[in-house]
Amino acid sequence: MGRPRKNVSQEKIQQLKRELELAGNRTDVLLQDKKGRSRSCLLCRRRKQRCDHKLPSCTACLKAGIKCVQPSKYSSSTSNSNTNNNTPTAGTVPPTPHPVIKRELQDSSIGAGAGAATSLNDMTIIKPISTSNSNVDAGDANEFRKTIKSVTTNSNPNLMRQDKDQYTIFLEKKLKSLETLLDLSPGCNQYNYELSQYKKVSHLFSNNTSDYSRPNSSNMVILPLPSPSNKPLENTNNNGSNVNAATNDTSASTNNINNNNAICQSASLLNDPLETLDFTKCIFAKYNLKKEFLMYDPIFELNEKLSRSFLDTFFTRLQFKYPILDEQEIYTFYDHYLHNKILIPPSSPATSSAAPPSNSHSYSEIEFHFLSGRMWLVFSISAYLLMTTGKYKGFPPHRYFSTAIRHITKCGLHLNYVQQIELLTLLVLYIIRTDRDSLILYDIIKDVMGISKKKLHLNQWYPNDPFANKKLRLFWCVYLLERMICVAVGKPYTIKESEINLPLFNNDSFYTKGVHAAAPSTNDHGVQFINQSLKLRRIESQFVETLQLLKNDSRSVKQSIDQLPLVRKFFEDLEVWRKSYSTLDVKNFENETLKLYYYRSVRLLIQPYLEFFAPEDRLFRECQAAAGQICQLYKIFHQKTLNGHSTPAVHTVFVAGVTLIYCMWLARNFDDQRRKKLGDASKHTRPLISASLFSTMDDLRACSVCLYVMTERSNFARTFRDTFDQLMNATVGNLIERCGPDSSELIFMASSVAKRTEPKNINDEANKAISSGDTLHDSNSANAANLSNSNDKNISHNGGMPPAVARIFGKGQAEEHAGFVENSQVDLAEQEKFKKKQGVLEKTSVPKSLAHLLTKMDDRSRISNSSMSYTTSSSSSSSSSSSSSTLSFPSSQEKNLKINVNNDNNGMTISSVNREHNNNHNNNNDNNNNNNNNNNNSNNNNNVNNNDNESNSRSTTNNSCNNGNNSQYVRNNNVTMENDVERPIQDQYIVKKPTNQTEFDWQVFQQQAFLQQQLAQHNLQAYLSSLNTDTMTNRSPSKSSSISTASSHSDPIPIAMTQSPTPYPQTSNMLPQQHVSRPLPQQQREQPQQHITSPQRFSESNFTNQLNNGMINSNPLQSAIFSNHTSENKQLRDVEESNFSTSPLRADYGNNIISSIPASFTSNSIPVSVKQARNGSSSGDILFSNGAHDMINNISTWTNNSVLDALNSKSILQTIFPQSQEPSSLSMDKQQQQHQQQNMCSENNVTANNFQQTQNDPSYNRNLFMMSNQEGVQYNLDETEKNGPKTQVEANTSANLHFDNVIPTVTNADIRKKRSNWDNMMTSGPVEDFWTINDDYGFLT
């Protein structure tokens, strides 16, 4: 038996293609012919088969469809073989008089197997075209076909095969397949099948085919598969539903041969091979686009219907926001290009010898390539826009961009400044929609603004300039893009507002020549939208520059209390813009887009100052609502679109979500301060069950949905999604922990509203209605929403935009913002079909008791009709009923008011009466319960009877906030007052223990809360340390910065448990017993503000001299973090020293990020996205410089405080670990511990007496945490909890600390080995184990 035929897999062929692509011109590297003896080509050597040495390619390479890589002695073998056969060699292909075969340069299926069907994108459309660029004579073509057939049929095929080699037989088969295609009618099923089976080989032939009128395809290279982000598009194009559309396009293009001559001429201008194009002279060369975009095949054939839809999409969906192009100029060149009306001067090497048409237009070669490249850029952008509908049937957008970049490369350095601005701006609009890092956007727009400012001086107005209108359009378009990108990535502006002296648009400047004639003369939507957008952007730029919100070094930014008047002033400017904006003058889609711009500006203004406001403050609620509106708008967009994203949108959604989380943590800290001022000794404050809480959770759900959808569409969003997910884990874990038995609840009693003067700069009734509901507390936010909605009715009468707090929830929310997605992006017929399917699903799967919760068809229409009014009928009715109910507050109950807190809000008598009524009813119920159940009073220390005078003596009032004569800003209470606007409003609370303080399954929830927070803490700190490393590498650590730094692969020094982060470790827990004060009595611990250890009491020299060298390393990241000893930090510490030791309302910005990273968290466990972020320009540089940096660090600090509290809490450890699995029992017995610890202490010259004291001291566990051996190995706190009793570590200790003794080092590694169970529980959860172990879901791991 002979050897079986060798089957070569397509994977090996594809692998060889990729090797050829990477090798480029260095194919000798692949040959590896060191001695120069090889005569076979690369493929035949790899297959170990005989090569026939044909030119220009051997038969095996032709069949495989790859480039024939030939050694130096390949030609000698060919010359010997040519003496024995008649096959032509290189350059011997004679010119043929028959019509040439024109193939469209679409996706090449070079590597496809002969028996494998390719996609429609890979089809080669065959059309007969003569050499004179004229129509093919059908009679001549048929006569030629008959002649060829007669020759082939009259001869004996067996005799012919004896005289022919495989090369000739292969070419004859290709010729027969082409003739078969000519006989078939285009569009039929057989034609499509034959076309899909055809494999191109002409790109492997010689370049000396000068008689062909079509361009030679030798510049085509072996192309890899598209990127993963484009695979959904490729799959959609391969569906059977696209066959008809593709065949229709094929037939249309076949019948329109006369209009394709310009395309042939365009392709002939790109006749040079790809490797000969000098991309270093291209205007895009500096942005590293060659490697990512030039690997795709260009497109030269143009479908008229699809291309015209591209232009219409661009000028309807982008031109009104960024009027960069002249619409008439684009359409004129497109018409010339499509109908072959372009004439290249004779000096051009690509000039056709045929006579030009009579109506042709002359273009120079540079001008032609510029206009062509610009047009193909528009096509690529529009292709991405059309992909959002899910109905796009064209080529992938990167292929249009590949054509554009080849045209632009031909221009070289001959582009003027205006052309450079247009091309670079279009490049920004394209890259925004690709899976690219945002840093490249800032680099491009910075160059564009530099050209506009320094070269063309577009920022100055010259009315006598004949091109003044075009320059105005160019600059404002670049300005809007530059402002949007700078805010998204957190980079400083490239041009100041003071340098801009330009008017807004009018009809003459906005509309281009010839287009405005068809536009309406009054109420032009385009001018109205672009002018309002410019006004809002200029207000935003003013407060960004004044408040210095965007700086090169974000750590130098100072947000102080003194800036709050400026914040209120700029917010007033935004309010003036909002009220003056008329929603009736613009389309619904443009109106919703401006809403997004407004919400984005409000969030950007208030977010850095959130910690200075109370949660009930107007600005706090506006910022929180604006962030929620942003998340909801983007959720609606992704809900109604199937594809599409933008990198600035990823930043916007992420920062909005982090802002919402930050607001929840600030509200928690504020409630903790209120509770502790009342003398409550509980550990936590129960979260208030309010409408605001559930509204925020709904907005966070929308943000999470958006980030997950964006990650599915773009790999760039993965880091943002994972970071937000860890923040949510920490937040939810903290909410669970606060609902435990050791927590107290704040009960809002009443608010006595003082009379106030009318606020200044408020002239309309709408603003009065808005400002009247400012003091509504979270516990009664439902009434607040009703009142604000009822009063916001006045807004719709003057056509102004509603504020961010005027929101619609539930069924009407999606319909309210439905206009955010343009109608062209939504298929109405498909929507109706989807609604019918949804109705069937409701009937079959949804229980009848829940069916009423879903939005019905009639409800949708009713809601959409009333969408212009910003309230629903239910909210208005509830607000009217609530406003009509008024009750007097009894004097006996006024004695029960526990705390007076001044709010800087504008009060409303109706709202306060409603709250008094609601809380009056609740208070009466509480009194009845207290009278009936005396045991509740004895068990609840914080629930005091109404007639108890001792409770009144314990009530506290913040006197510093009661100064109504001056404008006072008190940080600890986050309260502001302005004398000319408002009067102090006193909200009164009591503290009450919950009645259901013992839950049967609380231990499970407590364990979940702890593990969830601890895992989130580790992951957050890993993200912060790894993503921000590149930004700090250029900074040299100072002397002071080396104090508190630790190796990134070891356990850094933790932040104090309940104190604000300090630039030094918690030294009170590092020293032996004789230098640490005893735990404070209970009476003194109730006033912990007198015993906070100041970090500035320690001497840097003493600290550094006493610590081991291996304990602290010079990590440049943490060095830069802890070295920021500014006056702001000192002032912040002074303020915090005089107040509470609870979790601060704002962690020190200069002393952030790294608190503790587990030792097990090495570089091997860091996610791939994080590792990639460390190399080069990554999203880590911009992830934390756009406003989220400060918030993430503070949240990480507060989460770390909760985790350290849990680690030092005996009750929690007993809950998490049963008696048989306590950390102490997991390691060794007590005698072994004492023996080992005595040996360690004797080695370090520590007496046995001191050791016995330190062993029983709770701070000894902290000492072990800071210990390190000679190899620099550090141990985490949780690794040492087993070595001693689990006693509470007091966070608030006061002592004069001295560094007299050197801390002993740990040299035994057995502790870490025996702590594996503890570490496994702390670093992983059961969910991860399920996905790892379960075989059914193994494909997900």
Curated annotation (Swiss-Prot):
Pfam families: Fungal_trans, Zn_clus. It comes from Saccharomyces cerevisiae (strain ATCC 204508 / S288c). Present with 1080 molecules/cell in log phase SD medium. The keyword Hydrolase does not apply. InterPro entries: Transcription_factor_dom_fun, Yeast_MetPath_Reg, Zn2-C6_fun-type_DNA-bd_sf, Zn2Cys6_DnaBD. The lineage of its organism: Eukaryota, Fungi, Dikarya, Ascomycota, Saccharomycotina. GO terms for cellular component: nucleus. GO terms for biological process: DNA-templated transcription; positive regulation of transcription by RNA polymerase II. Coiled coil: none annotated. This is Uncharacterized transcriptional regulatory protein YLR278C. The modification Phosphoserine is found at S1143. SUPFAM superfamilies: Zn2/Cys6 DNA-binding domain (SSF57701). Residues 1057-1076, 1091-1116, 1220-1230 have a biased composition (Polar residues). PROSITE patterns: ZN2_CY6_FUNGAL_1 (PS00463), ZN2_CY6_FUNGAL_2 (PS50048).
